[in-house]
Amino acid sequence: MDDLLASIGLTHGTRSSRKGTWTEGARKPVGKKKKLAAETTKVPTPKIDFDFSSLLAKAPAVVHGFSTRSGGVTRVYRPGLPKSQGDLNLGFTSHDERKNVEANRTRMMQALLGKEAKDWKLVTLQQRHTPVVRVLRDTEATHLRGDAVMTDLPHRLLGVMTADCIPVLLYDRKNGAVAAFHAGWRGTLARIVERGVGTMKIEYGTDPKDIVAAIGAGIGPCCYSVGEEVRHEFESQFAYAPELFSDVYESEPIRDKYPLLFMTARAPGHSPIGPQLHLDLWEANRRQLLDAGISAKKISVVGTCTACGTSRYFSHRTEEGFTGRMMSVIGVR
C-alpha cells in the first residue's frame, strides 16, 4: 500500500493539493500562507446631500451648497434613526451637543471641498433677524454679528443658518466677491438682500448685471401662514405686496374623498372658519433681486419647501422649534 501511495505522491497522514501540503489534523497550510479576510466590515460614512444652484455650479471659481439634514452624527432630533445614521445639524442649538455640531461642520466642509477643506475657514454669523450686512475684511475673523456677510477674500466659506427662513447666495463674477444672506420675514421686509447688493456696489464696485444669485430651500407659500399685521407691514413697503400673499383653505381629506357627504356644507369662503393668509418669501426675495438690478436669467430658485419636507430638511415651524439648522455656504477659491 505504501508503494502504491508513494507512486502517486502521497504518504500516510498527508494530503497534496495545488495550494500546498496540509498535515492531517492541521488547520493552517504548511506551505505558503494565505491572508484571511477581516471579519469586521467598515461602516461607510453616511452620504451628505446638498442642494445646488445650476447657475452657480457653472462658475469654477465658486464653491457653494445648501446643506440638508442627512449625513451627520446628531441623533437628538430623530432618535429612531438606524445607529449608522444621524442628522447634519450645523447650528449650536440648546438641544445638541457642541461636539456633534463641530463634527457635523467638519463633515460638511470635507464633503463640499474634499482635500481642499484644510485650506478653508468657515465664517458664520450670530443671526438675529436684522437687516445688518457685514463685510469680511479680516482674514482671521470667523464669527460675526448680523444676518448677511460678504467678502472677496479667497478660501473663506461664508455660511448662514436656516430652518425655514430663506437663504440667498450671491456671486459677483467680475470682481470675485460673494455674499450670503439669512432672510426671514423681518429681514425680507427690511430689504436685506437689496441692502446687500448696494453694499457690494460700494465695497467692490459691483455691477448688478454681473451678479449670479441663488435662493435656497425655505418655507414655501404652501405652508407659511402669517397674520394680517404682516400683510400690512409688507403693503407699506412694497407696491407688489398683494402678489406675495394668498388665501389658503386647509385641505380636508375626508371631504375630498367623500364629497357627497358634504353636499349641504357651505361653499369655500362662506364657512365660519376663514382661509389662512400665506406669504411667498421666495418670490419676495426674488423681486428684491430684480429691483436691485439683477437679471431674471441669473436668479435660480431651489423652490423646495422645508416645512413640507422634514425628511430632508429641518423646519422650525413643522417641528415646533425642536429642530436643527441647515447651512447655506459660498466662497471663492
What residues fall within each predicted segment?
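Active-site microenvironment for binding and transforming phosphate-containing groups
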Residues: M1-R333
